A protein has these predicted regions:
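Catalytic cysteine-centered active loop of the rhodanese-like fold, especially the PTP/DSP P-loop
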Residues: 96-145
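Flexible, polar/low-complexity N-terminal or interdomain linker segments that lie immediately upstream
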Residues: 2-77
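Envelope-exposed proteins and targeting segments
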Residues: 62-63, 71, 82, 104-107
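Conserved beta-strand scaffold positions in the cores of enzyme catalytic domains, especially
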Residues: 49, 66, 83-85, 135-137
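A mature extracytoplasmic/lumenal domain signature
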Residues: 70-73, 79, 87-90, 112-116, ...
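Active-site neighborhoods of enzymes that stabilize oxyanions during catalysis
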Residues: 150-154
Length: 154
C-alpha cells in the first residue's frame, strides 16, 4: 500500500489514484486520461467487493436488492433468501424487467457460487454500464453464505 511521505501512514485508495492521475497529467494529457480511467475503474472494482460480515449486515438491514448471477436452474434449487435471479447468461433478456422493478439508486449486492465464479462480477459490470452505480459484489458467494448458516430458500 502506498505511504504518505510526510506521515508514513497508508494513503486511501482514491487519494492514491488521484495523486497518480495528477502526476501523470504533468507528463502527458493523453497518458493521464488513460491512467485516470484505469485508476477509477480499479478503485471501483476494489471498493465493490464485500466480505461475509459486510454482506450479512446489509442483508439484515433490508436495504439492498440481492441478485443471484447464476443460471435460473440453480437459482431455483437454492439462493439467498429474498434474492432475485439476473443470470449472466440471460442478462439481456432479464434486464428490462429488472429495470422496471428496481430504481437506479437501489443498493444491489450481486453474488454467484463462490469467490472464483466470475458471473457476479460480470453482472455487476453490466448493471453499472446500464446506469446502476450502487452495485457491490459479495465475493464469498452462496457456498460461503450457506456454510455460515445464513437464510436461504429454494
Amino acid at each position: 500500500m502506498p505511504l504518505n511521505i510526510m506521515s508514513g501512514k497508508p494513503l486511501p485508495g482514491k487519494l492514491f489514484a488521484t495523486l497518480v492521475v495528477l502526476l501523470l497529467s504533468s507528463i502527458s494529457p493523453s497518458l493521464s486520461q488513460l491512467h485516470a480511467a484505469e485508476s477509477v475503474a480499479l478503485v471501483k472494482e476494489v471498493s465493490a467487493e464485500l466480505d461475509l460480515a459486510a454482506t450479512k449486515a446489509i442483508f439484515d438491514s433490508h436495504s439492498a436488492c440481492f441478485v443471484d448471477a447464476r443460471s435460473e436452474y440453480v437459482y431455483y434449487k437454492s439462493h439467498i433468501k429474498g434474492a432475485i435471479s439476473l443470470s449472466d447468461s440471460r442478462f439481456d433478456e432479464q434486464f428490462p424487467d429488472f429495470k422496471q422493478k428496481k430504481a437506479i439508486e437501489t443498493l444491489i449486492v450481486v453474488y454467484c457460487t463462490e469467490s472464483s465464479c466470475g458471473k457476479a462480477r460480470r453482472v455487476a459490470r453490466k448493471l453499472m454500464k446500464n446506469g446502476y452505480r450502487n452495485v457491490r459484489v459479495y465475493s464469498g458467494g452462496l457456498i460461503e453464505w450457506a456454510h455460515a448458516g445464513f437464510p436461504m430458500e429454494g
